[in-house]
Every structure is written in structure tokens, then in C-alpha cells.
């Protein structure tokens, strides 16, 4: 006999994850991410870091997006990462951009990976010294914060995409 633990589909309550496809439109993803942002969103011509397409300012609780950036993939990557910063600041009592930078990069990577946006620009292979020197329990706690922030952002994005898809299907019926 080969005994295994199995579940009946009726015993589960999870949603089916959207299939990753490389042909998703980064512009549509950007629009959706900005629509579901947990903080205020504002367009600007200049950011504190000129090579960034988006920047989260914790003092003002605002996500700034640079105007006229031609590369929609780069904008999607920056917005995803900065949404990570915004969600992490909401979920924690003491927020430090420098301390939570790696977690935000990981969240941006996971969002882009899940929605089919190129992820080569994310430096997730360099683990910060502060995280590498922690005890396993502390590392699990940090990873748990990252996972929770990612899950929250993803649920908002997928709910909004589903809502938009429903609206489009209703329009086609007319």
C-alpha cells in the first residue's frame, strides 16, 4: 500500500492562482497596481533618485510615479517594488526604507514574476548582511512579513483584475 494524505476539492477554500503568462500587458498591470495602491498616488516630473520610475515617500504616505518614462516594463518593476515599500510601512510600526529595501525588492520580484513581467533587473541573489547574520527564527519572521505583504498586494491586484474582466464581459454582452 502507498498511503498518502489527500484532500477533496470540496474541503479546500483557496482560489485558483492566475496562470503566469508572458504576454500580459505591463501597462494594464501598472494601471491595476496604481488603482489598488494602499497609499495616495501622485504623478511627478522628478524623483529623489533619477533612475527610478516610482518612489514611495513614507512621511507623506504617497507613491510618486514619474511621468513620461518610455519603458513600461521598468515602470511596472518600480511600481511593484515601491508598492512593497508602501505595504511594508503599513504593516509595521517602525518603517525604515533602508532596512526594508531587500524585502521590497523581493515583493516587487514576486509580483512581476506572478504577472509575467521581466524580473532580470531585481537583485534578489544578494542577501543583506543584516539578514544573513540573523537566527533562523528571526529570518522566518522577516520572510513572514514579506509573504504577508505580498499576499495582500496580490489579492488586491487579482481582485481588481477579476472585477475589470467582469466589467468587460458585461460590456461584450450588450
Question: Model-found features: residue ranges?
Answer:
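N-terminal accessory/interface modules of nucleic-acid-binding and processing proteins
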Residues: 1-174
Amino acid at each position: 500500500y502507498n498511503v498518502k494524505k489527500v484532500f477533496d476539492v470540496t474541503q479546500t477554500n483557496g482560489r485558483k492562482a492566475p496562470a503566469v503568462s508572458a504576454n500580459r500587458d505591463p501597462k494594464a498591470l501598472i494601471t491595476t497596481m496604481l488603482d489598488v495602491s494602499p497609499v495616495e498616488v501622485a504623478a511627478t516630473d522628478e524623483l529623489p533618485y533619477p533612475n527610478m520610475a516610482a518612489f514611495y515617500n513614507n512621511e507623506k504616505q504617497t507613491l510618486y510615479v514619474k511621468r513620461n518614462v518610455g519603458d513600461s516594463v521598468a515602470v511596472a518593476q518600480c511600481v511593484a517594488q515601491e508598492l512593497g515599500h508602501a505595504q511594508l510601512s503599513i504593516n509595521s510600526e517602525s518603517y525604515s526604507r533602508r532596512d526594508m529595501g531587500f524585502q521590497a525588492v523581493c515583493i516587487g520580484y514576486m509580483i512581476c514574476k506572478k504577472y509575467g513581467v521581466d524580473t532580470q533587473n531585481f537583485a534578489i541573489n544578494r542577501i543583506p548582511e543584516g539578514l544573513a547574520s540573523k537566527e533562523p527564527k528571526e529570518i522566518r519572521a522577516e520572510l513572514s512579513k514579506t509573504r504577508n505583504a505580498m499576499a495582500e498586494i496580490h489579492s488586491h491586484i487579482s481582485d481588481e483584475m477579476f472585477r475589470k474582466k467582469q466589467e468587460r464581459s458585461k460590456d461584450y454582452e450588450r
